[in-house]
């Protein structure tokens, strides 16, 4: 197998891999951050969450800063490289739809940043878990509406073309 066909096959698979990582990150956020909502932890969470989120955000933000743009780039590259192959296998629609679902994740940025600001600033005072609960609901909804369908589309596209 020559380098060019192998490279194209790898390119076809990469959006599925990158969207898997961002979907897993969203699931990890839900599982790990949701622990703060347990009734036995709420009182401590209301004082600990603001600094924890502020410090943690500096550590995990790279997943978002790299993961989504990488998925966009890989989706676009797939639509541009060996387009006749995509057309012949019916994968063009799947890569396009996966890309659009992935981009749709950013429609939630304003809402997400508002809830995050509330958490980091300890708002509402004495009940930060209220903001955390709302962020968790928004994050789960966003994952189900954007990240999961993007992942399914990219997996389907790769399976059709490979």
Curated annotation (Swiss-Prot):
The lineage of its organism: Eukaryota, Fungi, Dikarya, Ascomycota, Pezizomycotina. Its EC number is 1.14.-.-. Its main location: membrane. It is found in: Membrane. The keyword Phosphoprotein does not apply. It is an enzyme of class 1 (oxidoreductase). The gene is xenD. Pathway: Mycotoxin biosynthesis. GO terms for molecular function: oxidoreductase activity. Epoxidase, part of the gene cluster that mediates the biosynthesis of xenoacremones such as xenoacremone A, a compound that shows inhibitory activity toward the PI3K/AKT signaling pathway and which has the ability to induce apoptosis of A549 lung cancer cells. Within the pathway, cooperation of the hybrid PKS-NRPS xenE and the trans-acting enoyl reductase xenG is responsible for the formation of the reduced tyrosine-nonaketide derivative. The alpha/beta hydrolase xenA then accelerates intramolecular nucleophilic attack to give a pyrrolidone derivative. The chain crosses the membrane at residues 62-82, 99-119, 142-162. The keyword Signal applies. Residues 1-19 form the signal peptide. This is Epoxidase xenD. One of its GO terms (cellular component) is membrane. It is a multi-pass membrane protein. Belongs to the epoxidase xenD family. Keywords: Glycoprotein, Membrane, Oxidoreductase, Signal, Transmembrane, Transmembrane helix. Glycans are attached at residues 46, 127, 139. Disruption phenotype: Abolishes the production of xenoacremones A and B.
């Amino acid at each position: 197998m020559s380098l060019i066909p192998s490279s194209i096959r790898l390119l076809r698979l990469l959006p599925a891999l990158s969207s898997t990582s961002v979907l897993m990150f969203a699931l990890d956020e839900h599982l790990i951050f949701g622990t703060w909502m347990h009734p036995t932890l709420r009182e401590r969470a209301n004082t600990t969450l603001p600094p924890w989120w502020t410090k943690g955000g500096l550590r995990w933000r790279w997943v978002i800063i790299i993961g989504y743009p990488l998925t966009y780039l890989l989706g676009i590259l797939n639509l541009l490289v060996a387009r006749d192959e995509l057309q012949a296998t019916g994968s063009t629609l799947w890569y396009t739809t996966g890309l659009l679902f992935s981009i749709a994740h950013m429609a939630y940025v304003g809402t997400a940043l508002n809830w995050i600001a509330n958490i980091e600033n300890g708002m509402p005072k004495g009940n930060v878990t209220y903001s955390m609960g709302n962020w968790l609901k928004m994050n789960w909804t966003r994952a189900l509406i954007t990240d999961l369908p993007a992942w399914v589309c990219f997996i389907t596209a790769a399976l059709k073309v490979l």
